[in-house]
Amino acid sequence: MKIGIIVQARLGSNRLPGKTLMPIDSHGNVLEYVINQIKHNKHIKKIIVATTNNSEDDKIIPVTKKLQVDHFRGNSDDVLDRYYQCAKLFSLGIIVRITADNPLTDPQILDGAIEKFFHESPNYLSNVIERTFPFGTEIEIFDFSTLHSVWKNAKLPSEREHVTTYIRNNQQKFKISHIKYKKNISNLRWT
């Protein structure tokens, strides 16, 4: 089964517009750091940046080319549809969801999450529902059939704007696994 990381990226943030391409230091911007971090994982080579069709996000495309990762453009408000169409186009059976504004995504945690996903075969695995990791280190993994079900059944605007809200609101419908840190440091904010 083909597995890929979809990195959700846009420049039109309300809290900090343009954050995705803001320079961190002389070595690169936030998106470059995110992608370079996740490239250190052991299991996945397919990385796709899923951005919007908005013209302001045209600036993201040269970064994807520079870093030699694929890109996909889709709906700016229906992020769930953007993910679904991206996963469908690239024939992904398993999707890892990362956001482009979290440069401290740890590839070792990503590796552990992927290994646990393959071992337990849940519909959805994350460090989001039962939080022990700092904010800004979110990793979510789900299979395409789960994404298809969510895409088909999510009706609320909040369930379309946020890719996995439907899963969190309907946990009884899914086999869910959690990754937890050895102690609870979820009070920290790394984003």
Protein language model features and the residues they cover:
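Conserved core of the sugar-phosphate nucleotidyltransferase
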Residues: 58, 105-190
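A short, N-terminal amphipathic alpha-helix
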Residues: 29-47, 60-62, 66-67
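Hydrophobic targeting segments
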Residues: 2-7, 31, 46-49
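N-terminal nucleotide-binding beta1-loop-alpha1 segment
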Residues: 1-17
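Short phosphate-binding loop-to-helix
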Residues: 53-118
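Short glycine-enriched, charge-decorated loop/helix-capping segments at active-site entrances
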Residues: 20-25
